[in-house]
């Protein structure tokens, strides 16, 4: 069975709207009812179970905010990553800088839930943060100080295939298992920090050294503006 509702934007034909019922291309029945009545009937068909508790899946421990769109099955996860040291490959798979100082990061992951227990990463945005205080809507956001990230914070992944995970909990370590496993190039390395170093010299300088917070450049956005 197929149900189709027809109405006109002509105010004089407002009450001439109708609901048709078709079966295999053959019209079986037709009802005339106003658009207001149709909306009321449609709204009443969505019953809310007040006794049902809706639970989120288990979430990453570094998650500070998330949104979920049930129509598109899209998840946006915002993870707060404390400053750490990481090996970084630059320009090719053979050139590796050891234990490079990475500042505190704010990473926004966007996942599409393709089916139960399957989440495809579609985009990620990376920003830097200062200090160790808790994040609030007024927290100032800074640019990711390395390369491969454009002016709005979106990471360019190039030919790297975006990962699929089986549980949102796995996003907790995606910065280690995916982001810093990619090869960094000079792409978008322009006004990313206030040092005068080229990317290779910067990575060399930061080996086994914490990233200097005073080198960060403001993104001209607050956390509250990012999550709007």
What is each model feature region?
Residues 2-163:
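Compact alpha/beta protein-protein interaction domains typified by the UBC
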Residues 2-4, 10, 136-228:
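Domain-scale recognition of soluble eukaryotic interaction modules
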């Amino acid at each position: 069975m197929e149900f189709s509702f027809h109405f006109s934007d002509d105010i004089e034909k407002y009450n001439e709207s109708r609901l048709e019922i078709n079966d295999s291309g053959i019209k079986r029945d037709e009802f005339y009812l106003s658009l207001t009545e149709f909306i009321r009937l449609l709204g009443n068909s969505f019953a809310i179970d007040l006794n049902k508790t809706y639970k989120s899946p288990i979430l990453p421990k570094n998650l500070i905010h998330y949104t979920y769109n049930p129509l598109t099955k899209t998840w946006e996860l915002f993870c707060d990553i404390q400053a750490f040291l990481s090996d970084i490959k630059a320009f090719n798979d053979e050139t590796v800088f050891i234990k490079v100082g990475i500042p505190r990061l704010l990473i926004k992951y966007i996942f599409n839930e393709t089916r139960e227990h399957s989440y495809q990463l579609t985009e990620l945005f990376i920003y830097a943060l200062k200090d160790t205080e808790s994040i609030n809507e007024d927290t100032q956001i800074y640019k990711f100080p390395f390369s491969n990230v454009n002016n709005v914070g979106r990471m360019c992944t190039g030919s790297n295939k975006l990962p699929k995970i089986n549980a949102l909990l796995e996003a907790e370590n995606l910065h280690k298992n995916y982001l810093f496993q990619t090869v960094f190039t000079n792409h978008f390395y322009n006004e990313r920090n206030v040092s005068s170093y080229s990317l290779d010299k910067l990575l060399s300088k930061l080996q086994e050294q914490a990233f200097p917070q005073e080198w960060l450049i403001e993104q001209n956005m607050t956390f509250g503006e990012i999550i709007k």
